[in-house]
């Protein structure tokens, strides 16, 4: 059997009882190690907690060499551990499909992820629209397809969760081209860099999906003991040092409820200014007043 086990957001102790029991019965344990990280638990701590070795599964192993993970899973139990919830990435869905095609039984053990824990910032989950990912820009690659999703969300008044890029066990273009197994140090996108890229793309696209004054909430180390929130405009957060990773950002939608705003004010250094930013932003995509159709003179 293949177990996909969610680990939660921060600590080795965030695993559920059901998930821990599944891991302990498995012959092999793999930890997916490229879409996210456990902020307060090392590989060695996990091995001590589970009482067995843990193999780090990088992007290449999961996407290209998944046969190693699925090896003998029809005869013995194998665990594939995922930070957050198992279905937070499409590659995990692909792994399940491959297992089922081989006749391997799959069991999923869910856990908390950024997709639901983001509610701890005070915004109501059913007021969120499409989630986007912000990747590190390079000199030759500055994707902006996510911009249209933000625009759609904002037009219908919904919040946008922005997931920030991480780079773990990545190769430089030169080392990749030369076939050298030399990897770059891990990198984690910061709130400030995300906001700078947001402003750059708005200047390029010019459709006013948002402005420098659009209110947001910056979320640092969600689910960890050092979790921190800060409310402010995109321009203000572009100069904000959010500290250690991991970081996320929420761009507020027009339909910001009074209770949501009251909660967000607790994270603002200048509450009156932030409240004014929210109220002005609510007018930004305000629908035109309804005009009844002309009556038929006949």
Swiss-Prot record:
Source superkingdom: Eukaryota
Any GO BP annotation: methylation
Disulfide bridge map: none
Reactions listed under catalytic activity: 2-[(3S)-amino-3-carboxypropyl]-L-histidyl-[translation elongation factor 2] + 4 S-adenosyl-L-methionine = diphthine methyl ester-[translation elongation factor 2] + 4 S-adenosyl-L-homocysteine + 3 H(+)
Pfam families reported for this sequence: TP_methylase
List of residues binding S-adenosyl-L-methionine: 9, 85, 88, 113-114, 164, 222, 247
Pathway: Protein modification; peptidyl-diphthamide biosynthesis
GO cellular component: cytoplasm
An example Gene Ontology molecular-function term: diphthine methyl ester synthase activity
Keywords for this protein: Cytoplasm, Methyltransferase, S-adenosyl-L-methionine, Transferase
Primary residence: cytoplasm
UniProt function note: S-adenosyl-L-methionine-dependent methyltransferase that catalyzes four methylations of the modified target histidine residue in translation elongation factor 2 (EF-2), to form an intermediate called diphthine methyl ester. The four successive methylation reactions represent the second step of diphthamide biosynthesis.
Family that this chain belongs to: Belongs to the diphthine synthase family.
Protein name: Diphthine methyl ester synthase
Gene, per the UniProt record: DPH5
């Amino acid at each position: 059997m293949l177990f996909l086990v969610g680990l939660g957001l921060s600590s080795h102790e965030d695993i559920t009882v059901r998930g821990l029991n599944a891991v302990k019965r498995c012959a092999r344990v793999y930890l997916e190690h490229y879409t996210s990280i456990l902020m307060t638990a090392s590989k060695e701590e996990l091995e001590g907690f589970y009482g067995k070795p843990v193999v780090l599964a990088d992007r290449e192993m999961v996407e290209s060499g998944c046969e190693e993970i699925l090896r003998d899973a029809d005869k013995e139990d194998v665990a594939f551990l995922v930070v957050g919830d198992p279905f937070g990435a499409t590659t995990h869905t692909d792994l399940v499909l491959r297992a089922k095609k081989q006749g391997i039984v799959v069991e999923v053990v869910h856990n908390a992820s950024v997709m639901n824990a983001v509610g701890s910032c005070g915004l109501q989950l059913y007021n969120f629209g499409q989630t986007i990912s912000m990747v590190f820009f390079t000199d030759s690659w500055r994707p902006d397809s996510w911009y249209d999703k933000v625009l759609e969300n904002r037009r219908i008044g919904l919040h946008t969760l922005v997931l920030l890029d991480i780079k773990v066990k990545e190769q430089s273009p030169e080392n990749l081209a030369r076939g050298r197994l030399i990897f770059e140090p891990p990198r984690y996108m910061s709130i400030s860099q995300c906001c700078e890229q947001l402003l750059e793309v708005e200047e390029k696209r010019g459709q006013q999906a948002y402005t420098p004054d659009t209110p947001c909430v910056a979320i640092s180390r969600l689910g960890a003991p050092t979790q921190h929130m800060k409310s402010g405009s995109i321009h203000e957060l572009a100069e904000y040092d959010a500290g250690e990773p991991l970081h996320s950002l929420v761009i507020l939608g027009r339909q910001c409820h009074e209770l949501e705003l009251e909660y967000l004010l607790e994270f603002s250094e200048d509450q009156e200014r932030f409240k004014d930013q929210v109220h002005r932003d609510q007018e930004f995509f305000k629908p035109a007043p309804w005009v009844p159709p002309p009556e038929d003179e006949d």
